[in-house]
C-alpha cells in the first residue's frame, strides 16, 4: 500500500521538485536522501532515480515505523519530519495519529491531511471503476540499466541507441 505514497508526493514524476527542494517520485529532501543511501551532489542526484529512491524510501519508512510503532504516524513523519511529529506527540501527550490531528494546534495542515490523502489514494487505486476511473492496463516499456564508466553526452547515447534525446532524458532524470 505504501507504493501509492509517490502518487500523492509527486504524481510519480521523477523530475518533480518541490518549493522546499524535495526531489523525485518520493520527494526526498537532500539530507534525508543522503541519510538513506542516495547520492546527491553536483554531478548526480539519485533522488530523481525512481528505482534507487524507492529502495531508500522503503528503508526510511521502515525506520519511521520502527520509531513510531504505527504506520499512520510513520507516514505523517515522512511528510512533516520525525522531529516535528515527536514534538507534537510530546506537547499534546497523544500518541494516536487520528487523535493528534483532531486539533489544529500540534501539526501543520499539510501533515494532518497527508495520511488521509494517502489512504484515499490507496482505496481509489485498488477500486478505480467504483470511483469512476476507467484505467486501461499498460505494458511497461522494457528498459535495461547501463552503467557507464564516465560522463557521456546524452545526445551521443541517443544516437547510439537510435532513439530521441528526450526519451533518454526521460529515462535518466
Task: Give the role of each language-model region.
Residues 1-3, 13, 41, 166:
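A local structural micro-motif
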Residues 9-14, 81-84:
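A short structural micro-motif
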Residues 1-7, 23, 71-76:
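Alpha-helical scaffolds flanking conserved acidic
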Residues 35, 39-67, 72-173:
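Extracytoplasmic and endomembrane cell-envelope/extracellular-matrix remodeling and assembly machinery
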Residues 16-37:
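Short, surface-exposed glycine/acidic/tryptophan-bearing loops
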Residues 1-11, 55-64:
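Export/targeting segments at the very N-terminus of extracytoplasmic proteins
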Residues 4-7, 17, 45, 170:
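Proline- and acidic/polar-enriched loop/turn elements at helix boundaries
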Amino acid at each position: 500500500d505504501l507504493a501509492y505514497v509517490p502518487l500523492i508526493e509527486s504524481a510519480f514524476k521523477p523530475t518533480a521538485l518541490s518549493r522546499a527542494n524535495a526531489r523525485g517520485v518520493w520527494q526526498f529532501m537532500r539530507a534525508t536522501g543522503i541519510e538513506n543511501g542516495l547520492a546527491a551532489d553536483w554531478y548526480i542526484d539519485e533522488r530523481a532515480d525512481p528505482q534507487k529512491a524507492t529502495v531508500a524510501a522503503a528503508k526510511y519508512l521502515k525506520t519511521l515505523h520502527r520509531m513510531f510503532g504505527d504506520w499512520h504516524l510513520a507516514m505523517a513523519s515522512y511528510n512533516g519530519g520525525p522531529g516535528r511529529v515527536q514534538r507534537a506527540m510530546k506537547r499534546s501527550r497523544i500518541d494516536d495519529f487520528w487523535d493528534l490531528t483532531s486539533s489544529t494546534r500540534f501539526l501543520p495542515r499539510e501533515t494532518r491531511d497527508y495520511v488521509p490523502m494517502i489512504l484515499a489514494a490507496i482505496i481509489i487505486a485498488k477500486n478505480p471503476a467504483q470511483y469512476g476511473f476507467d484505467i486501461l492496463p499498460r505494458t511497461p516499456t522494457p528498459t535495461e540499466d547501463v552503467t557507464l564508466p564516465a560522463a557521456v553526452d546524452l545526445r551521443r547515447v541517443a544516437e547510439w541507441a537510435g532513439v530521441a534525446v528526450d526519451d533518454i532524458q526521460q529515462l535518466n532524470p
